[in-house]
């Protein structure tokens, strides 16, 4: 059997940022003609159930401080640096970050950042605004989430990856549909809580609400980790607007956009950056879109683990539960999942 007509024995379930990144890593190993991605949604779709396109998508201190989370961040930071330099068309660029806290920050994260994040600098206490007790500046990244997803999607199709739009009720359907499968990757995000054969009770939604506004003069990411709420301003590269947020509401499945929440976001973001709406406050906002999405959170952190498809001997690699860090930790997570799978994949 030639390389061109080998069976599609590598199955990835899910086409969010984690699933697509996993497929890209495998494709770079020359495995694209053997990859099938099964997903209810792909990057041209928009649904509250499909989280990845709604993300602010930047690199900040939101992620956890366990050893894996710190390592995944570092790996992904260097990956984004490479893409920003070599593939500007992917929708990733270097950007200034200013991050502030009204409470004690994660010192393990700060120590880790100080070893690799460019231009990292603690803001002097005298320069901190309001009730803030700590802040730092750094050079990190901005990602135009929908553009980046579409970039990966088109790249993978051109490389020979097959996409099948389908909603699975049980993970074993991957093997029933593709009996030649040598490995299955479970990159289903929030759906891991409901997918038969997985049904992870530790997975839960963290509701987010963001407002996309027109503000081409804004180039810096600014984040306030407040005592009562988190406020963030995240420009999207390639004239993609500016994401204003937000909310972190664990366990909340509400899909509705509430006008009072939009107003609250605009008030907080304009207070954090008065020049955002040219000093006019919420009344000066030029709204492009309002969005609600559900971050795929998990008690105990993300799951990157080798398992088997129930009732079979086919290896199953879980890679989900990144919550709001699917972009900034995603490449590291996907790389780990591929490393778990490689011994099960015949490369010749």
Curated annotation (Swiss-Prot):
Residues holding (R)-lactate: 232, 295
One cellular-component annotation, GO: cytoplasm
Chain positions recorded as anthranilate binding sites: 232, 295
One GO BP annotation of this record: D-alanine metabolic process
Primary site of residence: other
EC numbers: 1.4.3.3
Subcellular localization(s) per the UniProt record: Peroxisome
Highest taxon of source: Eukaryota
Co-factor requirement: FAD
Residues annotated for FAD binding in this entry: 15, 18, 40, 52, 56, 58, 295, 323, 326-328
A molecular function (GO) term: D-amino-acid oxidase activity
Catalytic reactions on record: a D-alpha-amino acid + O2 + H2O = a 2-oxocarboxylate + H2O2 + NH4(+); D-serine + O2 + H2O = 3-hydroxypyruvate + H2O2 + NH4(+); D-alanine + O2 + H2O = pyruvate + H2O2 + NH4(+); D-arginine + O2 + H2O = 5-guanidino-2-oxopentanoate + H2O2 + NH4(+)
Keyword terms: FAD, Flavoprotein, Oxidoreductase, Peroxisome
UniProt enzyme class: oxidoreductase
Family recorded in the similarity comment: Belongs to the DAMOX/DASOX family.
Role description: Catalyzes the oxidative deamination of D-amino acids with broad substrate specificity. Enables the organism to utilize D-amino acids as a source of nutrients.
Protein name: D-amino-acid oxidase
Organism: Schizosaccharomyces pombe (strain 972 / ATCC 24843) (Fission yeast)
Lineage summary: Eukaryota, Fungi, Dikarya, Ascomycota, Taphrinomycotina
Gene for this chain: dao1
